Swiss-Prot record:
Protein name in UniProt: CTP synthase
Regulation: Allosterically activated by GTP, when glutamine is the substrate; GTP has no effect on the reaction when ammonia is the substrate. The allosteric effector GTP functions by stabilizing the protein conformation that binds the tetrahedral intermediate(s) formed during glutamine hydrolysis. Inhibited by the product CTP, via allosteric rather than competitive inhibition.
Organism phylogeny: Bacteria, Bacillati, Bacillota, Bacilli, Lactobacillales
Gene3D superfamilies recorded: 3.40.50.880, P-loop containing nucleotide triphosphate hydrolases (3.40.50.300)
Organism: Streptococcus equi subsp. zooepidemicus (strain H70)
Stretches for region Amidoligase domain: 1-267
């Protein structure tokens, strides 16, 4: 029988529900259980694919092409699993599916209501996420906080699950903030008490409290919360601020969180062996070197817009025993005149993805600086496309070269819209999304990075591709197309082999990086950056 764990939040948002859920998932996986995890987002968008990065942060793409919440990145990195489209559910997605069924007459003339139709659809998504992965345990995080009007149908569905599958198969974990008032010199439990009262008013009695705090929590405070919130004292778990996120699973295990969960759900499984994870954390906290990477982006005011990029850089830094020092460079501010000032101290330059005209000229200048000064450079998605544009302009003499996306009237459309995208009008869910194969060119930098594999599978999110009309011109000038689709039609990786490292990929390699298994192309880039720093000392 599948076990269901539901993680809710109270008092304030952004208190780390996703990290708690992911950490618990890692502990249960290390007990030998097959775990999957999903996020409920109560907003009305179908998915975050068309949302501004300033509103939502990055869009995380799964193997099967779902555009999802960035928390799924945390889930995959912590638990080391690949999730699917059932792992992110929004209000908009549920309502659109229910309304589509109503239009088809599938409800046989019934009045369509929140209960039972919306709640039934939500419960079906929970169960589908478990069955499609054949999981022993599914952890479902509900976005937002208890008391938000948008969350009510989701919480009602969670309440009903207890009756549907049995109380011994369901566990409710409530995460809250425990504020510390310096003036009073004490922690305040009232916000948590009121949050639990609100949750209980909706018919959900939490079985565990996870309290987010900056300071150590005395047992007396835990006992008080246990008494007023009607949970066992040992089930009041402290989630204190840490230096590195990957410490959190170990901290939770030290408080027997996973054992309490297993006892409640009647799971008779061995203790979690966290030896390898602990060794990884110890290494992360004792890195001997540093390397400086300039990240040139258009959304740098909100680092969450590049969350997976940053995490992938860190993972590859761990593999090189190096901490990554990031210089956040706003592409809008970068010009040919100030490129040396902004980029001159960098050991490596990364140009990540994006959409639209703004900031593209600055990114092109960053790529040009990397090429002309032989600074290791990695381009991702739009960064790959602009790598081609930069080469066309400044090496091939095509001064007005551009992407069709950025200038439909350009005489040199180096990057063109994909043929199957030409007549598409909807913006959401219509990109080339998900896992696709990339055939590697033997002897190339890309092939070396991937241990000379012939084909790798990587996740994509784009609508435009390199225009093959110009391929011969590029190759004649020494530009290497080191990764292509199996039919040779789509360019996936480009490089200049004579440089220290000058490689750009159309796909998003960062989405498959893990702390204990860094993505290979990122690792090759960071290795080159570390070497570049050593050479310049």
């Amino acid at each position: 029988m599948t076990k269901y764990i539901f993680v809710t939040g109270g008092v304030v948002s952004s208190i780390g529900k996703g990290i708690v859920a992911a950490s618990l998932g890692r502990l249960l996986k290390n007990r030998g259980l097959k775990v999957t995890i999903q996020k409920f987002d109560p907003y009305i968008n179908i998915d975050p694919g068309t949302m501004s990065p300033y509103q939502h942060g990055e869009v995380y793409v799964t193997d099967d092409g779902a555009e999802t919440d960035l928390d799924l990145g945390h889930y995959e990195r912590f638990i080391d699993i690949n999730l699917n489209k059932y792992s992110n559910v929004t209000t908009g997605k549920i309502y659109s599916e229910v309304l589509r069924k109503e239009r088809k007459g599938e409800y046989l003339g019934a009045t369509v209501q929140v209960i039972p139709h919306i709640t039934d659809a939500l419960k079906e998504k929970i169960k589908r996420a478990a069955t499609t992965t054949d999981s022993d345990v599914i952890i479902t995080e509900v976005g937002g906080t208890v008391g938000d009007i948008e969350s009510l149908p989701f919480l009602e569905a969670l309440r009903q699950m207890k009756a549907d599958v049995g109380s011994e198969n369901v566990m409710y974990i409530h995460t809250t903030l425990l504020p510390y008032l310096k003036a009073a010199g004490e922690m305040k439990t009232k916000p948590t008490q009121h949050s639990v009262k609100e949750l209980r008013g909706l018919g959900i009695q939490p079985n565990m409290l996870v309290i987010r705090t900056e300071e150590p929590v005395e047992q007396g405070i835990k006992n008080k919360l246990a008494q007023f919130c009607d949970v066992n004292p040992e089930a009041v778990i402290e989630s204190r601020d840490v230096e590195h996120l990957y410490q959190i699973p170990l901290n939770l295990q030290a408080q027997s969180m996973d054992q309490i969960v297993c006892d409640h759900l009647k799971l008779d499984v061995p203790q979690a062996d966290m030896t390898e994870w602990s060794a990884m954390v110890d290494k992360v906290m004792n890195l001997k070197k540093t390397t400086r990477i300039a990240l040139v982006g258009k959304y740098v005011e909100l680092p969450d817009a590049y969350l997976s990029v940053v995490e992938a850089l860190k993972h590859s830094g761990y593999a090189n025993d190096a901490a990554i020092e990031l210089d956040w460079i706003n592409a809008n501010d970068l010009t040919a005149e100030n490129a040396k000032k902004l980029l001159g101290q960098a050991d490596g330059i990364i140009v990540p993805g994006g959409f639209g005209q703004r900031g593209t000229e600055g990114k092109i200048q960053a790529i040009r600086y990397a090429r002309e000064h032989d600074v290791p450079m990695l381009g991702i998605c739009l960064g790959m496309q602009l790598t081609c544009v930069e080469f066309a302009r400044h090496v091939l003499g095509m001064e007005k070269a551009n992407s069709f996306e950025l200038d439909p009237d350009t005489a040199y459309p180096i990057i063109d819209i994909m043929r199957d995208q030409i007549d598409i009008e909807d913006m959401g869910g219509t990109l080339r999304l998900g896992l696709y194969p990339c055939k590697l060119k033997a002897g190339s930098r890309a092939a070396a990075a991937y241990n000379n594999q012939e084909v790798v599978q990587r996740r994509h999110r784009h609508r435009y591709e390199f225009n093959n009309k110009f391929r011969q011109d590029f190759e004649a000038a020494g530009f290497v197309f080191s990764g292509v689709s199996p039919d040779n039609r789509l360019v996936e990786i480009v490089e200049l082999p004579e440089k220290k490292f000058f490689v750009a990929a159309q796909y998003h390699p960062e989405l498959q990086s893990r702390p204990n298994r860094p993505e290979e192309l990122y690792t090759a880039f960071v290795t080159a950056a570390v070497k570049n720093k050593n050479q310049s000392l």
